[in-house]
Every structure is written in structure tokens, then in C-alpha cells.
Amino acid sequence: MALRNTVDFLLYDWLKVDQLNQRVRFADHSRETFDAALDTCERIARDKYAPFNRTVDTQEPAFDGEKVILPACTQDAHDAYVQSGMLSAAQDYDIGGMQLPYTVEAAANAFFACASVSIGGGMLTVGNANLLMKHGSALQQEVFALNEFNGRFAGTMCLSEPQAGSSLSDVATRATPDGDDHASDPFGPRYRLKGNKMWISTGDHELTENIIHLVLAKIPGADGKTIAGTKGISLFIVPKKLVSPQGQLTGERNDVALAGLNHKLGWRGTVNTLLNFGEGKYPVRGATGAVGYLVGEAGKGLQCMFHMMNEARIGVGLAATMLGMAGYYASLDYAKTRTQGRPVGPAGKDPSQPPVRLIEHADIKRMLLAQKAYGEGALALGLYCASLVDELHTGDEAQQHQAQWLLEVLTPIVKSWPSEWCLEGNSLAIQIHGGYGYTRDFPVEQYWRDQRLNMIHEGTHGIQAMDLLGRKVLLEDGRGLKLLGERMQTTISLALDHSHRERSDAIHLQAHALALRQAVQNITEATQAAWAGGEPAVALANAVPYMQAFGHTVIAWVWLQVAMSSQGEGDANLGRRQACQFFFHYELPKISAWLNVVKSRDSTCADMPEAAF
């Protein structure tokens, strides 16, 4: 119930999500319908996910040469998720959706991630289908996207290759027109693809009737050459099994072959694959090459894929958050029951006294408070960003523009900050368990292993940082950064006003508001200083410290808002106020060191000769 109470507070007391039913799209909804969705997901997560988190970690996917073998619990969890309707939760009624706000959908999915982050792959299927609903043709939407929303098909995103991980401009997969009639295929221009795709999550399995791959590839010109860089990349639908325009399987296997499984540190319940496209293992109509259908315009594939990637980045941030929360809950339970050591009194420790529980030690409280501040702060940010998606889709014109610009600058943060700091939280959860935490007798080591992926996939930490400092804060003369700064200044003013009206915690709110004001000023100065010379290589050399400081400032802003909404009586409100105070006292001061190297354009790292390592 601890997670549910936190989710309810953030949704209803802070974000006021129940007021969304004043908008036409959500007019049929109320807190009652939102709670029903949350109840269903909480129950399925408790019954079908949580009991099998260790099972999917120890019984990794296996390949028997023909198909992927998964434990039975994975199929059960998948089926329960499909039956819940969550794959199409935010979609229109007329295509089987519930028209739930994305904020509620994200909160509901948090229960699954907390119970077992790797047992389900719904995020990729939904992202795949959403991309097609935005960029696909009417028939592509009807046959592929709608069958993903109803759970009949699954979806993937195929970007990386063995030689090109994050460097998408170097993709070597090629797409050539499939016959003289390729342009007249009902599904869109038809091509044959040849190449390899690496690190493809849910790339092969038997959980669904079919798998729909969205694949990035380049189309050679008449001279056989491709356009250099990302401008020449196109996007294709490549089904594992071919489908008729009526949506039925034709009985033909497409030329997509599983080359092998990647055996990972964590996140082991999710199949991760190397796929070969067009190698000839499954020739189609007597010819090699995987059949694929162009999505959108040729050469515009990366722009289409970014729609899915941005959704995936918010999803990764929420997954990272829930792993942090899972570790927090586990270590909190352990600290409440494990006895160890004696308290320090005026005369030191008294060995005649019985040992006390871990939670009675100040340093254990420090580690628990850190986890609470990281996890609940990240969850608040994730749900806030989800609410911006709702603004983007249902707000008036001004609200939509503001939501778009805020999401531009916050998406790198909502992905990267939980990935880094909830990983630290998981490390602290192990520390609280002591030696037991380092064993497989307790779940915290698995949470850490699962968590370690999140700084890598869907855009590495460094790439997120360069995207933030190198692009997002500069767009349209820093429009998004300025808007975020205005939102923060509004919160600061409210907090200062709040501190004069409330009898409790007034001095803390005032101090926090002033500290946030200084942090915002420091971020602004660092942004300007980094680009003072106008040289990208110099400015971006310290992009990660910049992102760390930026993220800490954003989380401080979020915590200040949460604290102002937690001024009532009760342990939960006190806990949130204490977590806010911890963050401002122990975490926010760190930004000075990070920003010092940004402001001075420190070149220590960039200047280090290779031979000196």
C-alpha cells in the first residue's frame, strides 16, 4: 500500500489529475474510473508479476535453434496485462481504448515496473503502435497498430547494429525496392532489407501471434551509394510473419532470423536479441531479403522513430524510478526488523543493552532518506512529465505549446536522472542489508543489476547530456529553458508566500525557495558560460556534470512543490517534508562542484592524451 498511497497523493493531491475530466476527451472519467484502473494494475502486478521476479531472473530466455523458450509465468503475466486493456489504455474508444489520461496510464504501469521490471515488454509494443498512429498509412494503422493495441501482435524498435550502437548515422542495413510493382503494395512502398540489428528487446518470442519490427535502414541511390549521416535513414515495418491486407497471417515466414540471445547482467526476463534481416534463412517467394514497408517519407525515418524514442525515454525513467522504489521498500522493511548494534548515548555505547533495529541508527536513516528522496522525487517528475503529455494532446493552443517546450528540456532529465540516482539508491539498499544484500537471498542485488541498464539503453547517459546542453536548452534562443525557469520562479514565489502563512515548516520552505532561486541562477549562468566561446567541443566536454546539476535543480523544484502540498498532519506528510529537506540539505549543494567545471569550460578530460591513461 505504500506505493499506492504515494501514487494517490501525487495524482490527486498534487497534480489534481481528477480535474482532467473537465476536458472533452476525459469527460466520461472520474476518480472512480481512475482508481479502478489503478486497482486492476496493482492487483495484476501483485499476483502475476511480483511472485515471479526472481524466476525470470534465474530462468533466462533460451533459444533451442528454432524458437525462444520462456518460463510459463511470462506468458501468464503477458496475457493478464493484455486482458487488463493497458496496451490501449490511452487510445480512442472506437479502436478499443479507454481514453485514460497518459498520467493515469503511467501511474498504473508503475505497479508493474515495481513488481518485476523485466517480465513484460508492453512499453515497446505501445510505443511502436503509437508511432504508426502518427506516421503510418491508414492500412498500416488498421492492420499493424490496432493489432498491437489489442495484444495480438507485439512490437519492437530496431535501431542499433553490432558496429553502430548509438551512432545511428553509421547503420549498414540496406533497403532496396522489391520488384517493379513495389510502389503499389497496399501497405506502402515495399522493400527488401538486408542487415543485422543488435540489442533488440523482445526481438523474438512466442508470446504473441506475430512481432512487428520497426527497422531503420538506408535506401541506396541509383549509383548504389547512400546519403551520409542520418538524413538518409528511412523507417520500415518488417513483420516476423507476413500479413495480408485483411490482417490475417499468410502462412509465410519473413526473412528475419534470430541469430542469438544476449545474456545480460540484469533485466533478464526480457528477451534481448541479435536479428539478421535478409540472410536467406527464410526466403520469401524464393528470394532473400526481409520484406518491409516504408513508413512515412524516405529519408525521414529518424524523425519518425524519435516519436517512439521519446516515449521510450519517459518509460525508461519510470522503470528506473520503480526499481529505486522497490529497493527502498525492501531495505526499509529490512531496517525495521533487523537488529544490529547499540545506540550511542551520552557515555558512548552500553554493551549491556540489547541491540536495536537498524532503523534506529542515524546513518541508516540517512540512506533510507536518500532512497526516498531519489525515488519519490523521480516518480513525481515522471508523473509531471506524463501530465505534460496530456496537456500536449488535450490542452488549448497555449498549453500545448508550453507543454511541448517543457518536454523538450525535461525528457533528457526524466530519462537520465532516475537512471543515475535510483541506481545510487539501489546501491544504498544493498548497503543497508550489509553482507546479506550482496547475496541472492534478498532481492536488492537484483534491483541493482536490473537498474544498471537504464543509463545505457534508449540513449546513453552521455548522449542525453549532449542532447540537453547541445540542443534542448538552445532551441529557439532557449525558449524551453526560459519557460522552465519561469515555472520554477512561480513555485519559488508561492513557497515564499506559503512560508508566511503556514505555522509549521515556514523557515524551511523559505530557505528551500531561496536555495532553489540560487540554483536556477547558477544553471542559467553555467549555460551561458559553456557556450561563451561558441565551440561545441569545448561546451559539451562537461555536458554530464551540467546535466547532473540541471537534474538536481529540477528535482529540487519538484520536491518544493510536493512539500507545499504536504503541509497537513500525519506521518506521510511529515515524511515528504523531511525528504524535501534532505534533498535541499544533502543533495542540492552538490551542483556547485558540477557547475564549476562547466562555467570554467574545464578541459581536464578533453585534454587528457590517450597515452597517459
Each model region followed by its residue ranges:
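Amphipathic, small/basic residue-rich leader segments at the start of a protein or domain
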Residues: M1-I119, L139, V143, S603-F613
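A glycine-rich, basic-preceded beta-loop-alpha segment at the flavin cofactor/substrate interface
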Residues: L242-A259, K264, V271-A312, L332-I359, ...
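Internal maturation/activation junctions in enzymes
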Residues: P61, L124-T125, G136-P189, N196, ...
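C-terminal helix-coil-helix/basic helical segment that borders enzyme active sites and/or dimer interfaces
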Residues: E376-V414, T527-A541, V562-D571
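C-terminal amphipathic alpha-helical interaction region
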Residues: L475, T491-F613
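Alpha-helix capping/hinge segments and adjacent helical runs
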Residues: R192, W267, Y384, W405-L483, ...
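Conserved phosphate/anionic-ligand binding catalytic regions in large, soluble enzymes, centered on
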Residues: A90-P101, V117-G120, G317-G324, E420-T439, ...
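A short core secondary-structure module
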Residues: P189-R253
